[in-house]
Amino acid sequence: MAKAPIRARKRVRKQVSDGVAHIHASFNNTIVTITDRQGNALGWATAGGSGFRGSRKSTPFAAQVAAERCADAVKEYGIKNLEVMVKGPGPGRESTIRALNAAGFRITNITDVTPIPHNGCRPPKKRRV
């Protein structure tokens, strides 16, 4: 008996008008994730995954490229407005927001959600170079 051909079902992308861009800017890398209002990830990109390795990974330009790639990944969802949440002290904080703005998103709100300890763990010792 011949098997019936299996048809690939086309996934329907849900349309989302508002999204949240989570930017994690560390000293070594920048991670950009765009989610819907409920927190479901729609797309993400990193500076390291965008082809930058080593010390070039921690540059504002690498963060800008990561933001552009993340914006391209979520274009099919129809997002128009973005709320931006920035975490971390890294060099990619500003350039990521500028790249998302240039990609055609309307940025409605920018929030800094960097975790600040209330005198928690002891920090590492100072570097001697």
Curated annotation (Swiss-Prot):
**Family, per the entry?**
Belongs to the universal ribosomal protein uS11 family.
Q: What is the species of this protein?
A: Escherichia coli (strain K12)
**Which parts of the sequence carry N-methylalanine?**
A2
Tell me the first and last residues of the signal peptide.
none
What more the UniProt record tells us is: Has been predicted to contact the N-terminal domain of IF-3 based on footprint studies; exactly how IF-3 interacts with the 30S subunit is controversial.
UniProt lists the gene as: rpsK
* Keyword field: Methylation, Ribonucleoprotein, Ribosomal protein, RNA-binding, rRNA-binding
Residues annotated as coiled-coil are none
Q: Does the keyword RNA-binding apply?
A: yes
Single GO term (MF): structural constituent of ribosome
- Identification of the protein by name: Small ribosomal subunit protein uS11
Task of the protein: Located on the platform of the 30S subunit, it bridges several disparate RNA helices of the 16S rRNA. Forms part of the Shine-Dalgarno cleft in the 70S ribosome.
